Curated annotation (Swiss-Prot):
The keyword Flavoprotein does not apply. It is found in: Nucleus. Nuclear serine protease which mediates apoptosis. One of its GO terms (biological process) is positive regulation of apoptotic process. Belongs to the peptidase S1C family. Residues 1-36 are annotated as: Disordered. The gene is NMA111. This is Pro-apoptotic serine protease NMA111. One of its GO terms (cellular component) is nucleus. Its EC number is 3.4.21.-. The keyword Nucleus applies.
């Protein structure tokens, strides 16, 4: 059975009342008035019962609130998220709301509560239980002005089998839902929600069939008299079974808070399970002990049996799995509530337990530990990842000591696995053991920026498989090294900075030796000296490209100057670290020199002085490939092993890659090469060469659309003749600039051209001059422009500057250099539009790469990048949301990726500079009104509350002189050092 812990699925629930079910089934029951022997009709009793329930519910809803919350950072086993749940007031004077622990969360929390009359108030967490699924939020009662807030009274003793109950909450995220049911069990073990997530244990749970779903977590379970008898906690996704937490220990915690007393929580680091007597007998329970227990507890079904005892815990080597708990401190035990009561009152004190092992009573003495002490209350941010001490939650599930550094967010430098982000334990960093968080902090504070250090780690699921890898220490993009600590007085996790970044160590030249390719032809074998590996690490999802590590082979264009060409899928923009690996031996940093706007290649530059190796400059072909040409394919597989094969060019045609739903870079307007050999489908990078070693084409990976949350990759070749002008500019020591006609083009057959109005003389001219393929080029889409003369979709291109357009290459960009002033080129187009020939003067543009972003409320804002302009006919604003972070106010209040922000507090924000000016004036923890436009040009407005403590406003921009990206904080709360 699949168990649903957090109850967040949005499924509609329709539950008939029990009375209605009885009537449908023809069920009748006799009711007699006291002192009377007259049977009352069923409808009379149902009517009275329903009226009492209506009166009760009308009172209860005054106490129930909808909790809108964000767990703002990944912590322990809980990911960052935004959600809704339920809570209810348990102390109206102090302003205390009871809800679930998985709502309050173990980590940082931000949220607000909405009462039944739609009054809103901020809430802060004041307590979350280390084990049991309950926590308390606090609000200011004086902020609720239009209703009399009522507290529900907790009556745990009224939860009995057969009791009729109502679950009053926000089921499936609705404002108010009332679900009916009957309590069927009061002695089931806590549900198991699976590994690597929060689980309650060492408590009884109450079971009922109420079919509650997402949003009902934290709902009060009330009886007909309006008393809260349990707390909604979880349920099954495959049945209408719900699990309620008993209120006994919750009531004790509430009284401690009301009396300003600490909520002590004791533990001997042992998990018990309630097992029925028949199982206990099989485990060795003696007949005498069973008889005594049944006599002492006539209504109980079994005893507690030890399930897990943690190593190095108070009960280690004293209690063993399968031991049956008989008594503690002379008090016979039959329930978890008794155990909790004794442990909580004896923290730091010795206790005496009697357990039965194979029919023999064994007396054990343990010192009760502090449960709060083994519950993490701080975490560290460094290198883009977050760490905390291993929690009792995780240690208990995997039966390991509560002592380790737990990687709660495997991102940034510590992204060990792109698929598995949770469950990693860091054992060593830089060959130094890290058994505790404090030791980890000491080790990390000594490592310079840009270092590569060895890390040993393992996963909780597989304790037997240690892993060793080398990680890149990023303290420049992710320069924060700080520790957050929970403050239960304010509800905020205060942070302090731990250490400033240590500057990177100077590079030293290193030697490397190439191993030639295993090819009999020596000229082809030497191609290995012209191929290097290019890898990238990106800190932010700029231009809507996921910030994941990428790697592929690149071709050296100029060994003396250190120029390398590689697929733009590997280097989508320049806001990242780029590295070149030479001969699988030497790793050196590189910088982005040139990004082609349409042809899917990037040129990067490394410092040749840092490498002492026989890197060679290839001979690049000046003759285009044709269909049927024989070439040698040299490529690299997914595990970066070189392969080679003789192959044939099978096709050269215009490229057509589908656009992604969220616009991002894709190659357009180029002639792509296909080959016969299947080896090309296994290689994401490589080259095509002649037998004399002349390089004819690049084999590149092209980023396509997302399918099932995975990027689709296309593999094709790019003729090196197409990049000849750019290479010549680079060899002269200059930086190229490309002006393009910013439209999308495709090809159509001669038949289609004739049917769409192309005159016969142009068709004859095409037939006489075309050498490779008979086709016409047509406009498939037009980028956003405010020019009067512009191309439109469906135009057929006849000529440009009186030159016949026979293929996509005839529309290539105009290459100039950056050392001369930019001049907007104008091209004379002759086209066929709706059957008529037209002449147009079309201006070319230089595509501007993104050079500035603003991070506000957890979303990344930038000017609309080229892919957005390619996809839209109208740009509503110069402030475009390209990404939004988990648990951010942007998600909580409704800013989506691909939205444009047009106004903030009714002030127009046409660009990022104006937007920054406006948001700088917005105070922390206040609402602002934001007007937006969707990608489909649908305007809407939201209100958003700022949270600068966890989501500061910052600006990241590229310095035009140095090319370095620099961050400036705009709105943030100070550290408490």
């Amino acid at each position: 059975m699949t168990i649903q812990a957090h109850k967040r699925t949005l499924s509609e629930v329709s539950t008939s009342s029990v009375g209605q079910l009885k009537r449908r089934e023809g069920y009748t029951e006799d009711y007699t008035d006291e002192g009377s022997d007259i049977d009352m009709p069923e409808y009379v009793t149902d009517s009275a019962n329903n009226q009492q329930w209506q009166d009760t519910i009308s009172r209860v809803v005054q106490s129930v609130v909808s909790v809108h919350f964000a767990q703002v950072a990944p912590f322990d086993c809980e990911s960052a998220l935004v959600s809704e749940a339920t809570g209810f007031v348990v102390d109206a004077k102090l302003g205390i709301i009871l809800t679930n622990r998985h709502v309050v969360g173990a980590g940082p929390f931000s949220g607000y509560a909405v009462f039944d009359n739609h009054e809103e108030c901020d809430v802060i967490p004041i307590y979350r239980d280390p084990v049991h699924d309950f926590g308390f939020l606090k609000f200011d009662p004086s902020t609720i002005k239009y209703m009399n807030v009522q507290a529900l009274e907790l009556k745990p003793a009224l939860a009995k089998v057969g009791s009729e109950i109502r679950v009053v909450g926000n089921d499936a995220g609705e404002k108010l839902s009332i679900l009916a049911g009957f309590i069927s069990r009061v002695d089931r073990n806590a549900p198991d929600y699976g590994e690597l997530t929060y689980n309650d244990f060492n408590t009884e749970y109450i079971q009922a069939a109420a079919a509650a779903s997402g949003g009902s977590s934290g709902s009060p379970v009330v009886n007909i008299d309006g008393y809260a008898v349990a707390l909604q906690a979880g349920g099954s996704t495959e049945a209408s079974t719900d699990f309620f937490l008993p209120l006994d220990r919750i009531l004790r915690a509430l009284r401690c808070i009301q009396g300003s007393q600490p909520i002590t929580r004791g533990t001997i680091q042992t998990q018990w399970l309630l097992k029925p007597y028949d199982e206990c007998r099989r485990m060795g329970l003696s007949p005498e002990s069973e008889a005594k227990a049944r006599e002492q507890f006539p209504g109980k079904i079994g005893l507690l049996v030890a399930e897990t005892i943690l190593r190095e815990g108070p009960a280690d080597k004293s209690i063993k799995e399968g031991d049956i708990l008989i008594s503690i401190n002379g008090q016979m035990i039959c329930s978890f509530i008794q155990v909790d009561a004794i442990l909580d009152e004896n923290v730091g004190k010795p206790i005496t337990l009697v357990v039965q092992r194979s029919g023999i009573d064994i007396t054990v003495e343990c010192t009760v530990g502090d449960l709060h002490a083994i519950t993490p209350s701080r975490y560290v941010e460094v290198c883009g990842a977050t760490f905390n001490e291993l929690s009792y939650q995780m240690a208990r599930y995997y039966a390991i000591p509560v002592r380790a550094v737990f990687l709660s967010s495997a991102t940034g430098s510590f992204c060990f696995d792109t698929k598995e982000k949770l469950g990693w334990i860091v054992d060593e960093v830089n060959n130094q053991p890290t058994p505790t968080l404090d030791t980890f902090i000491e080790v990390m504070s000594t490592i310079p920026d840009c270092s590569r250090v060895t890390v040993q780690y393992h996963h909780l699921v597989d304790q037997h498989s240690p892993h060793v890898t080398t990680v890149y220490i990023d303290r420049h993009w992710c320069n924060e090294f700080r520790i957050f600590e929970r403050n239960d007085e304010t509800g905020i996790w205060d942070y302090k900075n731990l250490a400033d970044p240590i500057p990177a160590l100077p590079l030293k030249p290193q030697t490397a030796k190439f191993i030639d390719l295993p090819i009999s032809n020596p000229k082809l074998a030497r191609l290995a000296r012209m191929l290097v590996m290019v890898s990238t690490i990106g800190p932010v999802p700029l231009d809507s490209v996921d910030p994941e590590p990428r790697k592929a082979a690149g071709l050296v264009l100029d060994a003396k100057q250190g120029y390398v060409i590689v697929s733009r899928r590997i280097v989508p923009h320049d806001c990242m670290d780029v590295f070149v690996t030479i001969a699988e031996s030497v790793l050196v940093p590189a910088s982005v020199v040139f990004l082609h706007p349409t042809q899917n290649y990037v040129i990067v530059k490394y410092d040749p002085a840092q490498v002492q190796a026989a890197v060679e400059t290839p001979i690049l072909s000046t003759e285009r490939l044709k269909r049927g040409d024989k070439v040698q394919f040299v490529g690299y597989t997914h595990n970066f092993r070189s392969v080679s094969s003789e192959t044939t060019v099978t096709d050269i045609s215009s490229l057509s890659i589908p656009s992604n739903m969220v616009p991002r870079y894709r190659a357009t307007n180029l002639e792509a090469i296909s080959i016969e050999s299947s080896v090309g489908s296994r290689c994401h990078s490589g080259i095509l060469a002649d037998d004399d070693g002349t390089v004819r084409a690049l084999w590149l990976s092209f980023l396509g659309e997302k399918q099932d949350e995975k990027d689709k990759i296309y593999l094709m070749g790019l003729d090196l003749v197409d990049i000849g002008e750019v290479v010549e500019v680079l060899k002269k020591g200059k930086i190229p600039r490309v002006n393009i006609v910013d439209s999308g083009f495709g090809s159509i057959s001669v038949l289609q051209a004739r049917l769409r109005g192309v005159p016969e003389e142009w068709i004859k001219r095409m037939e006489s001059e075309s050498e490779n393929r008979l086709q016409f080029i047509t406009v498939t889409r037009v980028s956003y422009t405010d020019e009067e003369q512009k191309l439109v979709s469906g135009d057929i291109i006849l000529s440009v500057n009186d030159q016949l357009v026979k293929q996509m290459r005839d529309l290539e960009g105009i290459v100039t250099t950056t050392d001369v002033p930019a001049v907007q080129q104008v091209l004379r187009f002759k086209i066929v539009r709706k059957g008529s020939i037209m002449d147009l003067d079309i201006k070319t543009i230089e595509v501007e790469e993104t050079s500035k972003i603003v991070i506000f409320a957890g979303c990344i804002l930038q000017a609309p990048h080229h892919a957005v302009r390619q996809a839209m006919l109208n740009i509503p604003s110069g402030v475009y949301c390209t990404f939004r972070g988990q648990s951010s106010p942007a998600i909580q209040y409704g800013i989506s990726s691909t939205n444009f922000i047009t106004h903030v507090n009714e002030i127009e924000t046409p660009d990022l500079d104006r937007f920054l000016e406006v948001v700088r004036t917005i105070p922390d923890n206040t609402y602002c009104k934001i007007r937006l436009v969707t990608f489909d040009n649908v305007p809407f407005a939201i209100s958003l509350k700022t949270n600068y403590h966890y989501f500061p406003t910052s600006e990241l921009s590229r310095n035009s002189d140095t090319g370095r990206w620099i961050e400036h904080l705009c709105n943030a709360t100070p550290a408490k050092n």
